[in-house]
């Protein structure tokens, strides 16, 4: 029964993305974001100030400075030490797409961004990809693709959840992370 449901779900997702003519995601251009006397563009904003960011459909839940050489639990399988310090940003887009962005300190940043995946039907943010990226100097993002792994029927009859999983969540996370 589970195999049949998975095949049906996969078939539905492929059909939705392949033949439905889903339009490209419309998106409002961002304005320069200012915090008191500093701006993000100047690189002078503290990690904690990122919670003040206001954009349509974007909510920053937490922005936490993480000390260098911190130990992280990687998907409950193992732990690793993340050598550089970084800013851990946790938030949501449109209320259902959870994401994290790990921002290296200015002196450690290579000037590039890395969006990580999570495999399978997703539903969780895997910190191993985030740790891997930030240790190499990338501003690194990950998303749960719009649902939680404990939700068994997240896509049944929910076209928006299927679209988020298929492509929107990755796109919106990348756009907002930048």
Language model features by range: what are they?
Residues 2-12:
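Bacterial N-terminal signal peptides that target proteins for export
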Residues 11-20:
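Bacterial N-terminal signal peptides
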Residues 26-112, 128:
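Catalytic-loop region of hydrolases
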Residues 110, 119-178:
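Cap/lid segment of the alpha/beta-hydrolase catalytic domain
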Residues 115-117:
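Alpha/beta-hydrolase
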């Amino acid at each position: 029964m589970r195999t049949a449901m998975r095949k049906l779900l996969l078939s539905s997702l492929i059909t939705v993305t392949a033949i439905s003519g889903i339009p490209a995601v419309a998106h409002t251009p961002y304005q320069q974001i200012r915090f008191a006397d500093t701006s993000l563009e100047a690189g002078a904003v503290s990690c904690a100030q990122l919670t003040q960011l206001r954009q349509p459909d974007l909510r920053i839940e937490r922005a936490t400075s993480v000390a260098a050489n911190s130990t992280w639990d990687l998907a409950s399988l193992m732990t690793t030490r993340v050598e550089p310090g970084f800013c851990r940003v946790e938030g949501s887009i449109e209320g259902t797409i959870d994401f994290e962005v790990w921002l290296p300190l200015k002196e450690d940043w290579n000037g590039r961004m890395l969006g990580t995946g999570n495999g399978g039907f997703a539903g969780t943010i895997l910190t191993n990809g985030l740790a891997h990226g930030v240790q190499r100097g990338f501003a690194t993002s990950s998303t749960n693709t719009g649902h939680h792994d404990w939700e068994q029927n997240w896509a049944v009859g929910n076209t928006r959840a299927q679209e988020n999983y298929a492509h929107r969540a990755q796109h919106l996370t990348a756009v907002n992370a930048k």
